[in-house]
UniProtKB/Swiss-Prot annotation:
Signal peptide: none annotated. This is Serine/threonine transporter SstT. One of its GO terms (molecular function) is amino acid transmembrane transporter activity. Pfam families: SDF (PF00375). It is a multi-pass membrane protein. The gene is sstT. It is found in: Cell membrane.
Length: 434
């Protein structure tokens, strides 16, 4: 029974959940027992999210390899830069178009809104070095991020077996989180019923404004910010490659809503472009967890919308801090459907917003997630391919072997690009040395 339920498209189930929740919220707002479904769903997410974030970041950091003969260094710089620039763009858009949400039962004042720079820094440092076990139990995401980065760095020195164990643990917890997310339609019924019964249709309409802001920002980043980065690296027209990656990778990712599922598609597309197999065989799978520009946008915009709703003044310093925090914490979630939403409590804690309030916003995220998560995944997955190709073309340009990107894209579309295997790359390198 569960297998048959799981085989049904999550998007279809969520759409049905939205319709059922909306109908029940309007027709029978007094049936408060329906709200329990939302509470159970949010409670399960609240329980699994800290462990999931901890293991994913730790696993991603432990896989970093240095010294390999590939374009890995350039790819990493592009991945991290793209995620950071995405977060900055999201914060800028949030300042230009501030949005307030309607949260049932939420007070308009944060628990402990930071008052000055000294208080913020002291609080951040104190929270970051908290006991890691307590952090997992209490949901202290700043400490979770800090310790996962340190432990992940330490794991780089361990054996492959140890790293495999950590990866398998992360995969196991991810599978548990995926099973919880499978029940999102039931949770959405409860959450939407509660929202409609307590805030009315007007409150729910604010979610549409939030969705439009999220999607518009992601489109702007992929069609303006990312192409500018490609141009800076290659000094060629970036749009043939940008649109091609969007077509071959972004469209499939939009419907699968999973960067991990899209990895084989990106690997084939890299081969079609004639990229170095030794390079893309590493960067594409890593991009499934390390390149999360779409996730950074979601975390930044939804966190600032929460801060606006709670009446928290966001200074320039805190906004910049949010950019870095969103960029770092987004590492590891692009391969999970709805994974970025689980990072909102960590980002919200920066402004003294309680975990309970933040999880209400996570619930809103799942309501709009049919579109938001699909667009986010498309941006993340397509940019994995975009920056993998850009890194190789940029390195070739620096070495005095510029590549005609438009011709490469055209050849890839016809399936006539020359494939660069590790053996061919080594032969070319040896001939240059001679």
């Amino acid at each position: 029974m569960y297998k048959r339920y799981k085989d049904v498209s999550l998007i279809l189930k969520i759409v049905i959940g939205i319709i059922v929740g909306a109908v029940l919220g309007v027709m029978v707002p007094s049936w408060s027992f329906i709200d329990v479904l939302g509470k159970l769903f949010v409670g399960a997410l609240k329980a699994i999210a800290p462990l999931l974030v901890f293991l994913l970041i730790m696993s991603a950091i432990s896989k970093y390899r240095s010294g390999a003969k590939n374009h890995f260094g350039t790819v990493i710089v592009l991945y991290l830069s793209a995620t950071l620039f995405s977060s900055i763009a999201a914060v800028a858009v949030s300042y230009l178009f501030p949005i307030k949400l309607v949260l049932p039962g939420a007070m308009k004042i944060a628990e402990s809104a930071p008052k000055d720079l000294g208080t913020v820094v002291t609080s951040l440092l104190t929270n970051a070095v908290a006991n890691p076990i307590s952090a997992l139990v209490e949901g202290n995401y700043l400490a979770i991020l800090f310790w996962s980065l340190l432990i992940g760095s330490g794991l780089r020195l361990t054996s492959a077996v140890t790293k495999k164990v950590v990866t398998e643990l992360a995969d196991t917890v991810s599978a548990v989180a995926q099973n919880v997310i499978q029940f999102a339609p039931f949770g959405i019924v409860g959450l939407l019923h509660e929202s409609l019964s307590k805030t009315g249709v007007k409150g729910v309409m604010a979610y549409g404004q939030l969705l439009m802001l999220l999607v518009a920002t992601m489109v702007f980043v992929y069609l303006v910010v990312y192409p500018f980065m490609v141009w800076l690296m290659t000094r060629q027209n970036p749009y043939p490659l940008t649109f091609w990656t969007l077509k071959v990778s972004g469209i499939p990712a939009f419907f699968t809503r999973s960067g991990a599922v899209n990895i084989p598609i990106n690997l084939k597309a890299s081969k079609d472009l004639g990229l170095n197999e030794e390079s893309y065989a590493i960067s594409i799978p890593l991009g499934g967890s390390a390149n999360s520009g779409g996730a950074a946008i979601t975390v930044s915009i939804m966190t600032l919308a929460t801060a606006n709703t709670m009446g928290v003044h966001v200074s320039i310093f805190l906004a910049l801090l949010l950019c870095f925090l969103s960029a770092i914490s987004a590492t590891g979630v692009s391969g999970i459907a709805g994974g970025s939403l689980l990072l909102i409590p960590m980002a919200a804690s920066l402004f003294g917003i309680s975990n309970d309030i933040a999880m209400q916003v996570v619930g809103i995220g799942f309501i709009i997630g049919v579109v938001q998560d699909s667009v986010e995944t498309a941006v993340n997955s397509a940019s994995d391919l975009l920056f993998t190709a850009t890194a190789e073309y940029a390195d070739d340009r620096r070495e005095g072997h510029p590549v005609d990107i438009r011709a490469k894209v055209k050849a890839a579309g016809k399936g006539t690009a020359e494939v660069v295997t590790p053996e061919k790359a080594n032969e070319a390198e040896e001939s240059e040395q001679v």
